[in-house]
Design a protein with these regions (language model features):
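Alpha-helical, largely C-terminal catalytic domains
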Residues: 1-197
Length: 197
């Protein structure tokens, strides 16, 4: 029991490092970049808030919230990989698998298995839970960038409207009622010069 709880507490201390992993997405007020912990919290809250619009059958919102909490934990060791950074995405899978091995090994076996399976399910994006989670994860980032008016990651990585639309496709599948809002936001950001047509 004592070793178990000590390992869990060590894991929690390392998980606190998510607050120091900064993303390429700014806060809505544009004052600074958000960190992984803030993103994960906003992702979970967005999943809860927009769940009534999900059209996928069999989605377990509690599992989606767990995915939101663990989906970026590996970035503590692997670092953030911006979606629009094509060169960084080349090594993403390998870096994140190595990080998952290192991070989840800190937990007791059954927790390690649960957390890793949540992370792998999210990453594979094959189940209704994972598709909804991916849709919300991507929407949260899109929404923050759009609402900030800075274009942050879109400008930095010369994002085209095609790349942004492709990135947002899980939303069209899981929450189609939001798709027109996304299209309007993309067009608005094209007109502002923040997304390349």
């Amino acid at each position: 029991m004592q070793i178990r709880i000590e390992n869990q507490l060590k894991f929690l201390a390392i998980a606190d490092s998510m607050k120091q992993v900064f993303r390429q997405t700014t806060l809505i007020d544009g004052s600074r970049y958000e960190n992984d912990a803030e993103h994960s919290w906003h992702f979970a809250l967005t999943a809860m808030t927009l769940f009534e619009y999900c059209v996928l059958d069999g989605v377990d919102i509690n599992r989606v919230i767990k995915m939101a909490i663990v989906h970026d934990l590996v970035e503590i060791f692997a670092g953030d990989t911006p979606a629009m950074d094509t060169s960084a995405n080349i090594s993403k899978e390998e870096r994140e698998r190595e990080a998952a091995d290192k991070l989840f090994a800190l937990l007791p076996e059954e927790q390690a298995h649960e957390y890793r399976s949540l992370w792998e399910e999210f990453d594979a994006m094959e189940t209704p839970n994972a598709i909804y989670a991916a849709a919300v994860d991507r929407f949260q980032s899109f929404y923050s960038i759009h609402m900030s008016g800075t274009g942050s990651a879109w400008v930095k990585f010369n994002a085209t409207s095609e790349r942004v639309r492709t990135r947002m496709l899980p939303l069209k599948t899981a929450i189609p009622s939001l798709w027109q809002w996304v299209e309007n936001a993309i067009n608005e950001n094209i007109s502002k010069g923040l997304i390349i047509k």
